[in-house]
Amino acid sequence: MSTLDIHQIAVLSDNYIYLVRCRATGACAVIDPSLAEPVLAAAESLGWTITHILNTHHHYDHTGGNEEIKAATGCEIIGFAGDAHRLPGIDRTVVEGDRVAIGQAEARVIETPGHTLGHIAYWFAESSALFCGDTLFSAGCGRLFEGSAGQMWDSLRKLRALPAQTLVFCGHEYTQPNITFALTIDPRNEALRARALEVDALRAAGRPTVPAFLGDEARSNPFLRADSADFQEAFGMTGADPVEVFARTRLKKDHF
């Protein structure tokens, strides 16, 4: 049973900010605030009191609201120890396996280098909620700005190993273009084709495609399928090292 209330805020062209609130205590965290004003307005409208900010990585579209929200609320800012020098206003640092308590709701920290070297995710197991920033997207993954293909593949495998019913809350609304790309390299994937229809219907109705179930991602996201025999066959890389398959997939997406 979920211990969290989750409120999703769409900002900029395609970013998502998340407010997560412990139902038992009212403690509330903001995850990846690119902007302050929409967060403060949403919290006031909901009657939620912000106590924490959780950053997944240092990019400004995930941290731009840190200091203004902290000044307005006195909240504690939490992020990866190795990126402390790049996270505005940080108060507390965490590493792999650390636990972060938002009231009685607890998240496990998972290090996910690749998009950036200091990227982390927060997994609230009791609520089946994964906040993964720009590592894993719905039907895609983040670009490799700092890390290697091997690092990113290892990070994605760590996330893929979580329970299939986990809800994936990522940092951007990229699902539709991600699926358009995926269909060019994995066109016979029935799970992917079914998702394409669902996603088109959601976007036509003006609705978000995030969150997505991790089990659906495992079946349809090409970046989670680099070690899948049928994906390797479809991609013309049967028997190849999954890191090489992932790297080739990422390169094709970068130039799509």
Swiss-Prot record:
Binds 2 Zn(2+) ions per subunit. Monomer. Belongs to the metallo-beta-lactamase superfamily. Glyoxalase II family. It catalyses: an S-(2-hydroxyacyl)glutathione + H2O = a 2-hydroxy carboxylate + glutathione + H(+). Transmembrane segments: none annotated. The gene is gloB. InterPro entries: Clx_II_MBL, Glyoxalase_II_hydrolase, HAGH_C, Hydroxyacylglutathione_Hdrlase, Metallo-B-lactamas, RibonucZ/Hydroxyglut_hydro. GO terms for molecular function: hydroxyacylglutathione hydrolase activity; metal ion binding. It is an enzyme of class 3 (hydrolase). This is Hydroxyacylglutathione hydrolase. Keywords: Hydrolase, Metal-binding, Zinc.
